[in-house]
Swiss-Prot record:
CDD domains: DEXDc_SecA (cd17928), SF2_C_secA (cd18803). This is Protein translocase subunit SecA. It comes from Geobacter metallireducens (strain ATCC 53774 / DSM 7210 / GS-15). Zn(2+) binds at C885, C887, C896, C897. ATP binds at Q87, G105, E106, G107, K108, T109, D512.
Length: 899
């Protein structure tokens, strides 16, 4: 109560922020006549003037009013688009490193030009991040004309570019691209063998469009670069044939002589937990699988891999649905993005899940992959010196943005008042009744010519609805992952009179739905069909479409604008709001309503019991609908419950990934220093001394007399590592103290090293150290990632021993990291001492082969969304003594099963 009184007196934080920015808007408006009076060349020359002032130390904040006024004037001259006052506020919010929440149709694409132009004046590069290649290309071309007019260069990063094209795009003042492309380029750069081959510059300023989609919805999905293992794929087919013989059961509580008076009992061969997205064998199921696979004990260490793949096959059959989670296209399983409904070709689930689904669908199975490099979007975007974002819906996730990214959300007022009523939800008992009601409402709208956008949460549901509409003879467009190519075209015309569009989730996001139709889109379509037409003819067609669409716009406004019809609630309220936000843009009329049933996934998994009780209490008959505040409240509570659960998962993930992030930074920094030639010899000398120290500590033990040291093992270790026989007179052996032995060993090793250096020469030695060190780092880092994966899989069990799994993970991960650093030093030293002088062309060939090997057969994966942390693919191979132990303990093989 006290807080609300204070808020009334001083205003909310959002109101105070807007109040602070309005005087700057007035200042920009005051400069408008001055900028309008400049010629094109004079306006363009302002960019050079700003760059000089910036280079001399003037802050961007002091340049802001003039720079924004120049950019606004350029927008008017190039596109006849003038930034509104609220768009200037949006630009200032982005420049200050915050998130601007702007409703659909308020011109976010144009807003981004203001902070992008201002920050590009530093010459450090600005990245504008979009959700797909289409938007990256569209926005870089569309807004790029403004930047080019002002003398700035623009680049775009999309799938399929080679390194030279990428390097050129990143060198531009402003670079557009997708989050996946930016992230994978970072990982790829850190696998290269020359700084000249890097494509990215240091991270300065990033504007993330649809920031909620990228930083929240995709935060649980790590980017993974992986290489194939040599494992046979036969096991997936064998296990897949077992699954149909297993019966799904359930867990129930029965009376028992326990403290609670109840115990859990499982029926059937396996149980499914849809909330946790997991499937588990029961005791009966384990026995049946053992019998079918003809093995004696599924939990025997020899068969643990079978257990893992059986569980993944269960998940593939019980939890992953065709045309919902994936589609099968041309003999390939392609993932469907859960949040956007878009296909993600080339992306694969990890940890054997993708192979299990391929076996289930009877398509060719590709080998599992081993992780070579990985990063989460959370840690990628936190590398930018300044990060900002914009979206139509961020306020519901403001807490998460602040806690994880230290980003505040500012809600920007609309340019015109919102005229869209959002009608209460209508709930039915069954999905059949719900769809019947949806068809009736569509008929009503269609008869009067009102355009309708129907939102579904999966391809499967959009196709069911499409079939029902075909039976009724109602013409419509279906927009889902299968029609991805026509996405923008369909969405652009969804506001035309009588148009009915069915769309999955957020498909078409980024393209405005204009009432009456989009004349530019229609003219472009005509141009594609008539490529040889003269420019005059195109101009006449465009004018014709503009007149038609303007007249149709007025008709559609009278009919009530675009009606949004949601057929199911999403787990996140934000995504429901995004669907609603497609209507009522820039003061246009519109409306929205959601139709639900107790069979919908959200209500069935998270809230159906409570909602069902309310419906029974209100005596709702079959076929009868209910619109009640209690029901709406129960649904919102179910959504809040899921949102809180997902937030905890993302928070949990970043706490685990922060450990890996610090290790990744150390390795990547070390690689860059080696590539830059920074103190290569000094680094190697340190490795040499560390290796000498490790050998001395292992054999010359304090408080043990020298006569009892294992001299045979010492001689073998020195020979194996340094390639020479250590020469210690027999009469002095027994009298050596550990410190004397260290000194003697160090002198002998350094003498041998100096001999190598003399015969190789400084230049060749530096080159060899660089190549061998990089090879050792990449090889050991790959194995370390595998060890960390195994550690993550088993760390939860530490909780049963009254230990904090998170703290245990940090300790174990640190120990594994230090072991890896020791192995890198050991491998580098050993190879340098054993290497022989070769011709220069042999060394160059070795380096070239190494680069080709590293870049060959790499695969770009999206790791599966984990419950605790990403779990990239495993590989199985025979372990050498210093490799991570295959049993999954996280220890070296020699200190575990190899004892």
């Amino acid at each position: 109560m006290f807080g609300s009184i204070i808020k009334k007196i001083v205003g909310s934080k959002n109101e105070r922020e807007l109040k602070r920015l309005w005087p700057i808007v007035e200042k920009i408006n005051g400069l408008e006549p001055q900028m309008a009076a400049l010629t094109d060349d004079q306006l363009r020359n302002k960019t050079s003037e700003f760059k000089e002032r910036c280079a001399k130390g003037e802050s961007l904040d002091s340049l802001l009013p003039e720079a924004f006024a120049v950019c606004r004037e350029a927008g008017k001259r190039v596109h006849n688009m003038r930034h509104f006052d609220v768009q200037l506020i949006g630009g200032m919010v982005l420049h200050s490193g915050k998130i601007a929440e702007m409703k659909t149709g308020e011109g976010k694409t144009l807003v981004a030009t203001l902070p992008a132009y201002l920050n590009a004046l530093t010459g450090k590069g600005v990245h504008v991040v979009t959700v797909n290649d289409y938007l990256a290309k569209r926005d870089s071309d569309w807004m790029g004309r403004i930047y080019n007019f002002l003398g700035l260069s623009v680049g775009v990063i999309v799938h399929g570019l080679d390194d030279e094209e990428r390097r050129e795009a990143y060198a531009a003042d402003i670079t557009y691209g997708t989050n996946n492309e930016f992230g994978f380029d970072y990982l790829r750069d850190n696998m290269k063998f020359s700084l000249d081959d890097y494509v990215q510059r240091p991270f300065y300023f990033s504007i993330v469009d649809e920031v909620d989609s990228i930083l929240i919805d995709e935060a649980r999905t790590p980017l993974i670069i992986s290489g194939p293992t040599e494992d046979s794929t036969d096991k997936y087919y064998i296990i897949d044939r077992v699954i149909p013989h297993l019966k799904k059961g359930e867990m129930k509580e029965v009376e028992a002589n326990t403290l609670s008076g109840k115990k859990k009992e499982y029926t059937g061969d396996f149980t499914v937990d849809e909330k946790a997205r997991s499937a588990t064998l029961t005791e009966e199921g384990v026995l049946k699988v053992e019998k079918l696979l003809k093995i004696d004990n599924l939990y025997d260490p020899r068969h643990m891999e079978f257990l893992h793949h059986v569980n993944q096959a269960l998940r593939a059959h019980a939890l992953f649905r065709r045309d919902v989670d994936y589609v099968v296209k041309e003999g390939e399983v392609i993932i469907v993005d859960e949040f956007t409904g878009r296909l993600m070709p080339g992306r694969r689930w990890s940890d054997g899940l993708h192979q299990a689904i391929e076996a289930k669908e009877g398509v060719e199975i590709e080998n599992e992959n081993q992780t070579l490099a990985t990063i989460t979007f959370q840690n990628y975007f936190r590398m930018y010196e300044k990060l900002s974002g914009m979206t139509g819906t961020a306020d519901t996730e403001a807490e998460e943005f602040h806690k994880i990214y230290k980003l505040d959300v500012t809600v920007i007022p609309t340019n015109r008042p919102l005229l869209r009523p959002d009608f209460p939800d209508v709930i039915y008992k069954t999905e059949r009744e719900k769809f019947a009601a949806v068809i009736e409402e569509i008929k009503d709208c269609h008869q009067k010519g009102q355009p309708v956008l129907v939102g579904t949460i999966s391809i499967e549901k959009s196709e069911i609805l499409s079939e029902l509409l075909k039976k009724q003879g109602i013409p419509h467009n279906v927009l889902n992952a299968k029609q991805h190519e026509r996405e923008a075209e369909i969405v652009a015309q969804a506001g035309r009179k009588g148009m009915l569009t069915i769309a999955t989730n957020m498909a078409g996001r980024g393209t405005d739905i204009v009432l009456g139709g989009n004349p530019d889109s229609l003219a472009k379509q005509w141009r594609r069909e008539n490529p040889d037409a003269a420019d005059e003819e195109y101009a006449a067609i465009l004018a014709k479409y503009k007149a038609e669409c303007a007249a149709e716009h007025d008709e559609v406004v009278k009919l009530g604008g675009l009606h949004i019809l949601g057929t199911e609630r999403h787990e996140s309220r934000r995504i429901d709001n995004q669907l609603r936000g497609r209507s009522g843009r820039q003061g246009d009329p519109g409306s929205s309503r959601f139709y639900l049933s107790l069979e919908d996934d959200l209500l069935r998994i998270f809230g159906s019991e409570r909602v069902s009780k309310i419906m029974d209490f209100l005596k709702i008959e079959e076929g009868e609908a209910i619109t009640h505040g209690m029901i709406t409240k129960a649904i919102e509570n179910a959504q809040k419950k899921v949102e809180a659960h997902n937030f905890e998962i993302r928070k949990h993930l970043i706490e685990y990934d922060d450990v890996m992030n610090k290790q990744r930074e150390v390795i990547y920094t070390q690689r860059r220093e080696i590539l830059a030639g920074e103190d290569i010899r000094g680094n190697f000398t340190q490795m040499l001394d560390d290796t000498i120290e490790d050998i001395a500590a292992a054999f010359a033990i304090d408080k043990v007399h020298a006569s009892e040291w294992d001299w045979q093992a010492i001689v073998e270790a020195v020979y194996k590592t340094f390639g020479f026989q250590i020469d210690i007179p027999a009469e002095t052996m027994d009298r050596l103290a550990p410190e004397s032995f260290r000194k003697l060993l160090k002198e002998s090793v350094h003498e041998a090293y100096e001999g190598k250096l003399a015969s190789f020469g400084d230049e060749l030695m530096d080159h060899l150290i660089k190549v061998i060190m990089l090879q050792a780092i990449d090889s050991q880092w790959k194995d370390h990632l595998l060890s960390i994966d195994h550690l993550k899989e088993g760390i939860g069990l530490r909780g049963y021993g009254q230990k904090d799994p998170k703290q245990e993970y940090k300790k174990e991960a640190y120990r594994l990291f230090m072991d890896m650093m020791a192995r890198i030093a050991e491998e580098t030293v050993e190879k340098i001492f054993w290497v022989q002088i070769a011709r220069e062309e042999d060394v160059e060939r070795m380096e070239e082969e190494q680069q080709q090997q590293a870049q060959k057969k790499i695969v770009f994966n999206l790791g599966e969304e984990p419950a605790t942390a990403p779990q990239p693919a495993r590989s199985k191979k025979s372990a050498s003594r210093n490799d991570p132990c295959p049993c999954g303990s996280g220890k070296k093989y020699k200190k575990c099963c190899g004892k």
